Amino acid sequence: MNSKSRTYFYFLFPQNKLVATVLLMASLSFMSCKHQQKITLNNGKCILDFKNSKALTANLKANEFKFVWLKGKLSAESTIDSTTNSFTVSLRMKKDSVIWMSISKLGIEGARVLITKDSVKFTNTINNKYFKGDYTYLSKMLNSELDYEMLQSLLVGNSVEFYDDDEKIKPGIDNCQYTLGTIRKYKLRKVIGKGKELKEPAQSIYLNPETFKITRILFYEFNPGRSFDAHFENYELKDSTQLFPMKMNYLIKAQKNIKIDIEYSKVILNEEQTFPFKIPDNYEQIVFKEKQ
């Protein structure tokens, strides 16, 4: 990158914002669904046949997005508290193995990310720096336990495993959608209304009643009031048989309020990919120190 391009990119995307955005994309890289639903109405209210948790879980699993290789291009906008940045991402994935990203602004690459099951790495090409570590820092930054499976699922609209076993998952219906949760909705409202606290985090998945694709994933920890809310919409048919969410929205409320909006413009399935990633010898390692 020449000096002029480097200066211009740095002005648009300062290092501290770039690092934060890269980490957010690495940690994520899970509105309501707007496609039409053929729901029976009675006096303006939808009517859905009740399904138990076993049936809903089976339908959820059967309709999850399946792939071995994935290549995509997407635009993203991140807001950390009141600071907003937009950028484009070239994404490549091999299921259960590698997530690779090239993050650019105005056509200039500013960062490259490589995520595996046990490591998170990225290079900052603007300042000749790199980060190499595990999920510990990302988890602390977002106040949430993160792992590879969670990141992979959230990037393609698949389910994230519940903390509790399947026998404790409660079925329900909310706003013309099926739900699966670790706490029933009426109990959740009762607890919140009386200002009580639950010892375990509450988790819910919302399902489109026709396709059984996920429209929302919600995690809520009552003490100290942390939440993660993911929405998936604009499902399109890919590979002639599968629905893929072309728009995603993530909202994290913790020490910082973080919002990420993603819109895919291209998704290609099951073409073998490469994951070019190299840390030049002259790059300086980024070391994040915990606040005392």
Label each residue range with its predicted role:
Residues 76-80, 126, 252:
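Transmembrane beta-strands of outer-membrane beta-barrel pores
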Residues 35, 39, 168-284:
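Gly/Pro-enriched, hydrophobic low-complexity segments
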Residues 1-33:
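Sec-dependent bacterial lipoprotein signal peptides
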Residues 62-70, 81-85, 92, 113, ...:
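Edge/loop elements at the starts and ends of beta-strands within beta-rich repeat scaffolds
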Residues 80-84, 103-112, 223-227, 253-259:
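Solvent-exposed loop/turn segments connecting transmembrane beta-strands
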